[in-house]
Amino acid sequence: MALPQESRQLAIILCGHNGSGKSTLWHEFLADHFKIPLLNADRLLLSLLPEQHGSRLWPAWAQRFRDQDSLWMGISQRSITGLMDEAIAKQATFAFETVFSCWQPMPDRTVHSKIDLIQRLRSAGYFVVLLFVGLADVGLSIGRVLTRVHEGGHKVAHRKLIERFPRTQQAVAHALGVVDAAILFDNSGALQQTYTPVHVRANKQILFDIREAGSPAGAITQWLDVVAPLS
């Protein structure tokens, strides 16, 4: 993949469906390689709550605060936006984690989405890399989130998961034509197939696509054909 020139700072958009494993991808496999801060509204909100020790569950009030307090969720999201604004103003390198599900058609026929952020970053001189973790279907997203909740993790309403899934796919499909480079991973399969790279592109040229390298599993093509259709 083409790397950013010294004159261009790096900005990484880490995105994926709820339960896709994007946080794990970053913290277990990528953080020590890139060595840059990851801006994440959920983690910022968690930093305001009591620390969890071992398998001990949070008290009920803390779980409600994390999962249901829309006021503080909004404060956390706006705080991350403020941090990002400052980072961009100072030309600091950073990564930003998001479900990337914002896709809102406007009355003037434009669409409000995170692609606006990508265009802003590129206009500010950043080399923008999109990392996306895909899942075969929304049922897998729902199942992963339920497992996470059972283990004491963050809850997301089923309705939101169902609404977000196709919007994320649509937004990523459009973003691929805007970013400088992108790597798409599949995380639909078993443990030994975790984070399979399935599509790599840079400067609007496809460098690798698993569909051209063989016969990928149907779980992969189920979403990859939607997000990055081959012409």
Regions from the language model: what does each represent?
Residues H17:
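P-loop (Walker A) phosphate-binding loop of NTP-binding proteins
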Residues L25:
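Hydrophobic positions on the alpha1 helix immediately C-terminal to the Walker A/P-loop
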Residues V99-E151:
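ATP-dependent NMP and nucleoside kinases share a basic, alpha-helical "lid"
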Residues A11-I13:
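Short hydrophobic/aromatic beta-strand immediately N-terminal to the Walker A/P-loop
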Residues I36-T110:
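Conserved nucleotide-sensing/catalytic segment adjacent to the nucleotide-binding pocket
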Residues L140-S231:
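Conserved GTP-binding G-domain of TRAFAC-class P-loop NTPases and closely related GTPase folds
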